[in-house]
Swiss-Prot record:
Residues 111-130 are annotated as: Disordered. The lineage of its organism: Bacteria, Pseudomonadati, Pseudomonadota, Gammaproteobacteria, Lysobacterales. This is Small ribosomal subunit protein uS9. InterPro entries: Ribosomal_Su5_D2-typ_SF, Ribosomal_uS9, Ribosomal_uS9_bac/plastid, Ribosomal_uS9_CS, Ribsml_uS5_D2-typ_fold_subgr. HAMAP family: Ribosomal_uS9_B. GO terms for biological process: translation. It comes from Xylella fastidiosa (strain Temecula1 / ATCC 700964). PROSITE patterns: RIBOSOMAL_S9. PANTHER family: RIBOSOMAL PROTEIN S9 (PTHR21569), SMALL RIBOSOMAL SUBUNIT PROTEIN US9M (PTHR21569:SF1). It comes from the Bacteria.
């Protein structure tokens, strides 16, 4: 019997997540480690589970995730988008619900580049009137 799986790619900031959705009992593993071990912060784990909780599929799928680049917040956001896209590939009727919650939208915010002559992207040297 072939393994049927659904795939979704998610990106946020400089992070990328490849999500593979398979029928199962609710195991989520990120880079070969369980979700609770990979993300130390509860908020990151909550972000990852949001699309599953919204569609009431928490214990219906086993999810295999490969996350690269960026930090924990970026990776959590990328995984959330990837899971949402994989769920839509599995069942298209979930799309309006996920879109309404904002899980289908790629967050376009990126780090602004540092400019020449400034300390950071916008931070300039202190201005002295006299």
């Amino acid at each position: 019997m072939p393994i049927t799986q659904n795939y979704g790619t998610g990106r946020r900031k400089s992070s990328t997540a490849r999500v593979f959705l398979r029928k199962g009992s609710g195991n989520i593993s990120v880079n070969g480690r369980p979700l609770d071990e990979f993300f130390g912060r509860e908020t990151a784990r909550m972000i990852v589970r949001q699309p599953l909780e919204l569609t009431k599929n928490v214990s219906n799928f086993d999810i295999l995730i490969t996350a690269t680049g960026g930090g924990t917040t970026g990776q959590a956001g990328a995984i959330r988008l990837g899971i949402a896209r994989a769920l839509v590939e599995y069942d298209t009727s979930l799309k309006p619900e996920l879109r309404k919650a904002g899980f289908m939208t790629r967050d376009p915010r990126e780090v602004e580049r540092k400019k020449v002559g400034l300390h950071k992207a916008r931070r300039a040297t202190q201005f002295s009137k006299r």
